[in-house]
Amino acid sequence: MRHTTASVLSAVALAATLAACGTTDDPADDDEAPESSAEPITLTDARGEEITLEGPAVNVAGTEWNVIEYLISLGVQPVGVSDIEGFEKWNNSVELSPEATDIGTRGEPSLDTLATLDLDAVFVTDQLVEGAVEQIEENTPVIVVPGGDAEDPIGQMWDNLDLVAQATGTEDRAAGLREQFDEAVADGRSALAEAGAEGSTVAFSDAYQAGETITIRPFGEGSLIGGVLAELGFVNAWGTVEGLEFDPVYGLGATDVEGLAQLPDDSAFWYIGGAGETDPFAETLSDNSLWTSLPFSADAVRLPDSIWMFGGPASMIQFVDAAVETAS
């Protein structure tokens, strides 16, 4: 899926995804939403704005899928979600309630729909169309969460999760998710070392097609996926490609088939797609002589669909499991 860079568990669901790294213990076994409290909560969002809520936010909406994953992972089912069909295609780490209302696109939610939901808070990123945040704030508290930070992608994920947890009164669940992620990474790294795969060179990407043109999107060292690869001890092959630039938020680059020739010959080439999406590498490029001549193309691996590359700890644990299984 194309996540533009200019503007890119419930407890039960998490437990179901953690078999590969032996991290099925979930300290947050209660799927019920946090109880309402009369104590006000004051927090500071990504804008530096101080926001005071009457109590833990329960009736909430989110415009970006990372926030939706955070909420469900923390035991809070959002009542409003942008592009529900897309979310369920691209992120299967958590299960969204069928009662959720679609509030429009991620970049431009429907203000009319939001106004009908009687919300305690709306979580957004800074990628909304100009003026949208101010309009939403006329009726509902808005909490702005950064999309990412290529300087510290994993650290930003935790900061985001902690902000959402603070607003919803679910800090204990957030701590449990951090423990599960750390355990998954430690177990994964041990498994890779046992298999002799630690330190392998990996080029991870996705791709999208417009007409006859295929754009390949490298996930650099500053991407969330790149950060997890580094935690597992892999070498990011894209870091060796001269002149390849990455955006400062999501750590993503752009190249084409010709650009792949600059990757080290010993690279493992991994990529991801969405359920039901065209596979540019296996389909469109299957008879492309340049692609098929690359030493790693014959062994290119499509990881399991619907691991959301810009998600939270639930998605990243899925990625750890997939990476370990693929490399071992």
Task: List PLM regions with ranges.
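Bacterial lipoprotein signal-peptidase II cleavage site
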Residues: 18-37
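Extracytoplasmic substrate-binding proteins
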Residues: 139-211, 313-328
